[in-house]
Amino acid sequence: AEFAVYQALAAPCIEIIHATATPVDIQTNGAQTNGTQLWKVEVGIANTGWLPTVVSVRAERANMVRPLTAELSLPDGAEIVGGANRVKLGQLSGRSAFRHDGGAHNDGTPDRVLATWLVCCAAVPARRITVTVSHPRAGTKQQTVTVG
């Protein structure tokens, strides 16, 4: 039983570490916007597990694991004008890759990724956009952001 618990704790686990929607100021040059506004939706995703999302080097070499994906669910009257609705974000390393020797070497943040969309929708009334992040080995998470 102890071995099974250890394996479960080492498994990859995706988390949405931040999700924001910020209005984008655009120059309309006097054109009518019909009450719509442009929003920048950003989602930060991290693998908080010990193992990478691909789990093993062998699976990575054989390209056996589908990538992490992020997808938006939009309210009526909203549309994505920058980016695709479903975005493939690749694989994320886990905490096993972190250096613990105190060296000055910086590997960046291979355990994190940022997805960004531009969404056009009416600002009033407030509308909700649901972000779904999923990976076949690291799970699925959802979060809602409000525009307007």
Which ranges hold each PLM region?
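C-terminal accessory segments enriched in acidic
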Residues: 1-30, 34-148
